Structures are given as C-alpha cells and as structure tokens.
A protein has these predicted regions:
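Extracytoplasmic
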Residues: 1-179
Length: 179
C-alpha cells in the first residue's frame, strides 16, 4: 500500500496533503483491524463530520507516507492539535467487542524505533522507518485548536518515503502535512 495510490508515481512535495493518506500508522503494539469496536486506545483514522484526521497518536507512534518527490524541500509542516476530552472522537454506536481486545500487548505486532520520550511534544522527521531523523517539528502542548507547526529538515532531492515518529506525553491529532 502506498500513499500515492492512483497518482501514477510519487506525490510532489508541494502544498499540503490530508494526513489520512498515511500508508503506515502504528504504535508498534496494535490489534489487527476488524469490524469490532476496541476499548483500548491506539492510533487511528477518524472523522468529525466532514473533517478527517489521525487521532490517538501517542508516544512512539510511527506515521508513514510513500512516496514523495522532493525538490528543494528544507522544511515540513503539520496541522496538529493536542487531543483533549473535548475534541476526542467518541464512538456512540453499539459495541461489537472482540475477544482480542483483552489479549496481552506482546501478542501484537512490535517494531523497534530508536528515540527518547520528549517533555515537549515533537514529531521526528525521517526518510526510513528506523533511520536517523532528518529534522523535527516542535509542537505546542497547549494547542487545543488546529495549528500549523513547521520544522527544518535536510531532505535530498529525489523520491523517498516520509515518516514521522511522535514523542511526547499528551496524545495528538494530525490533520494535514505541508511542504
């Protein structure tokens, strides 16, 4: 699965894209998808009305996009906000619980990502899942409304995947990625 889908090639790293085109979204410890409603928190694609975004992004979450065509890109931005009880999407339908909800975490997919938790929320910018960061985007832990944040990045020209790894205590939501 790629983010560029029917584009016949990599997306141009210009303008902005909805965050929900991510082709990788994991905290390294997630249940496999099903039509059940899970009562555990994990990164997910969701919506409020017509607005689509990634939610429940917590420490160590990996968000990946394949592929972009980079040309003279020196900074990357995101439209993000801190997840609060007021903006968190609450499921209001009937529960269809899956017995896997209560399985131990070590039975789910695990990936190793180097990095240290951060007191200030930060998104590392990477070109590979486990590679060294090429930049970072510092977020404001008080931003409860959609806010655009930018970070400098050293990205060589050419085609590449783009990954973000989140470090921080509060959960965040991500609406757009920007170039």
């Amino acid at each position: 699965i790629t983010s560029c889908g029917l584009n016949q090639g990599p997306l141009r790293a210009e303008g902005s894209y909805p965050s929900v085109i991510a082709c990788n979204l994991t905290n390294g410890n997630m249940p496999h998808g099903s039509n059940s409603i899970f009562q555990i928190s994990f990164p997910n694609v969701t919506h409020q009305g017509e607005e689509r975004f990634l939610a429940e992004i917590s420490e160590g979450t990996l968000i990946g996009y394949k592929y972009f065509s980079f040309r003279n890109v020196t900074r990357i931005g995101v439209m993000a906000r801190i997840e609060t009880e007021d903006n968190k999407v609450q499921y209001k339908g009937p529960l269809r619980l899956d017995e896997r909800v209560t399985e131990k975490a070590d039975r789910h997919h695990q990936i190793r990502r180097p990095g240290m938790p951060s007191e200030q929320p930060v998104l590392e910018i990477r070109l590979t899942e486990t590679g060294d960061p090429v930049g970072e985007i510092l977020l404001d832990e008080n931003a409860e409304e959609w806010t655009k944040f930018w970070g400098n990045a050293e990205i060589p020209d050419g085609e590449s995947a783009l990954y973000f790894v989140y470090h921080g205590t509060p959960r965040i939501q991500l609406r757009d990625i920007c170039f």
